[in-house]
Amino acid sequence: MRIGHGYDVHRFCDGDFITLGGVRIPHKYGLLAHSDGDVLLHALSDALLGAAALGDIGKHFPDTDPQFKGADSRVLLRHVVGIVDNKGWKVGNVDATIVAQAPKMAPHIETMRQQIAADLQVELDQVNVKATTEEKLGFTGREEGIAVHAVALLLPA
């Protein structure tokens, strides 16, 4: 049994939507990133890679590589699942916390969970996503960006 932690953050930029957990959410900003900026899937990918002692997404999908420019983070997450599987591990469960003042996440969380469960090839009850604010404190409270913490439990395949 292995446990991994992932953390990622992206700052806001010009745009009119963000993508979190594979879900396109209307917003007054976009997220600045080399890929699609899905900070939730990036943190989950890091948690999975960390649990398997396989580094992080920067190692596997460097932002200096043009092939990952604008990449769909769901495709990257599925690739991470394949890497972890090849090392003899399967996902036990994942849990993530989105830290954002806005937009409101509650209307989108179930769809995020469904997308993530499909990409991880697990049941819905093995995926938890929740959201909180920092009560207008820090960079997320000032609506400068979004952060996500994620943990993953891996079991022998």
Curated annotation (Swiss-Prot):
Source domain of life: Bacteria
Species of provenance: Pseudomonas entomophila (strain L48)
Residues the UniProt record annotates as site (Transition state stabilizer): H34, T133
Reactions listed under catalytic activity: 4-CDP-2-C-methyl-D-erythritol 2-phosphate = 2-C-methyl-D-erythritol 2,4-cyclic diphosphate + CMP
Similarity comment: Belongs to the IspF family.
CDD domains per the UniProt record, alphabetical: MECDP_synthase (cd00554)
UniProt EC number: 4.6.1.12
A GO term, aspect molecular function: 2-C-methyl-D-erythritol 2,4-cyclodiphosphate synthase activity
Organism classification: Bacteria, Pseudomonadati, Pseudomonadota, Gammaproteobacteria, Pseudomonadales
Keywords: Isoprene biosynthesis, Lyase, Metal-binding
Protein name according to UniProt: 2-C-methyl-D-erythritol 2,4-cyclodiphosphate synthase
SUPFAM superfamilies recorded: IpsF-like (SSF69765)
Residues given in the record as a divalent metal cation binding sites: D8, H10, H42
Quaternary structure, from the entry: Homotrimer.
Role description: Involved in the biosynthesis of isopentenyl diphosphate (IPP) and dimethylallyl diphosphate (DMAPP), two major building blocks of isoprenoid compounds. Catalyzes the conversion of 4-diphosphocytidyl-2-C-methyl-D-erythritol 2-phosphate (CDP-ME2P) to 2-C-methyl-D-erythritol 2,4-cyclodiphosphate (ME-CPP) with a corresponding release of cytidine 5-monophosphate (CMP).
Cofactor: a divalent metal cation
GO biological process, one term: isopentenyl diphosphate biosynthetic process, methylerythritol 4-phosphate pathway
InterPro entries per UniProt: MECDP_synthase (IPR003526), MECDP_synthase_CS (IPR020555), MECDP_synthase_sf (IPR036571)
Pathway annotation from the record: Isoprenoid biosynthesis; isopentenyl diphosphate biosynthesis via DXP pathway; isopentenyl diphosphate from 1-deoxy-D-xylulose 5-phosphate: step 4/6
NCBIfam families assigned: ispF (TIGR00151)
Residues the record lists as binding 4-CDP-2-C-methyl-D-erythritol 2-phosphate: 8-10, 34-35, 56-58, 61-65, 100-106, 132-135, 139, 142
Cofactor binding remark: Binds 1 divalent metal cation per subunit.
